[in-house]
């Protein structure tokens, strides 16, 4: 029973770590006042956008497509 509880705790910790790792690769790309979001990018995609002169900011996946986010985009345009 004790081993089962420990195994379940480890699985929960791993699940949280995977979610956080996935969220790191969501980012917002801005160029000449136009911003859009990328969530399914590859790891090196952030570097490629930066090299091209884009303003790249990491955004946690939970904040995507909320009303507040849309209002911020309207202010920038």
From Swiss-Prot:
<dbReference type="GO" id="GO:0042742">
    <property type="term" value="P:defense response to bacterium"/>
</dbReference>
<feature type="propeptide">
    <location>
        <begin position="41"/>
        <end position="77"/>
    </location>
</feature>
<keyword id="KW-0732">Signal</keyword>
<keyword id="KW-0929">Antimicrobial</keyword>
<feature type="modified residue" description="Arginine amide">
    <location>
        <position position="40"/>
    </location>
</feature>
<feature type="disulfide bond">
    <location>
        <begin position="26"/>
        <end position="39"/>
    </location>
</feature>
<keyword id="KW-0964">Secreted</keyword>
<dbReference type="GO" id="GO:0005576">
    <property type="term" value="C:extracellular region"/>
</dbReference>
<keyword id="KW-0027">Amidation</keyword>
<comment type="similarity">
    <text>Belongs to the tachyplesin/polyphemusin family.</text>
</comment>
<feature type="disulfide bond">
    <location>
        <begin position="30"/>
        <end position="35"/>
    </location>
</feature>
<keyword id="KW-1015">Disulfide bond</keyword>
<protein>
    <recommendedName>
        <fullName>Tachyplesin-1</fullName>
    </recommendedName>
</protein>
<comment type="function">
    <text>Significantly inhibits the growth of Gram-negative and Gram-positive bacteria.</text>
</comment>
<keyword id="KW-0044">Antibiotic</keyword>
<keyword id="KW-0165">Cleavage on pair of basic residues</keyword>
<feature type="signal peptide">
    <location>
        <begin position="1"/>
        <end position="23"/>
    </location>
</feature>
């Amino acid at each position: 029973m004790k081993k089962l509880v420990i195994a379940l705790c480890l699985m929960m910790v791993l699940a949280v770590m995977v979610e956080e790792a996935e969220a790191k690769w969501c980012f917002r790309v801005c160029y000449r006042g136009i911003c859009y979001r990328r969530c399914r990018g590859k790891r090196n995609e952030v570097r490629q956008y930066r090299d091209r002169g884009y303003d790249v900011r990491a955004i946690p996946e939970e904040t995507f497509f909320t009303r507040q986010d849309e209002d911020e985009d309207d202010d920038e345009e």
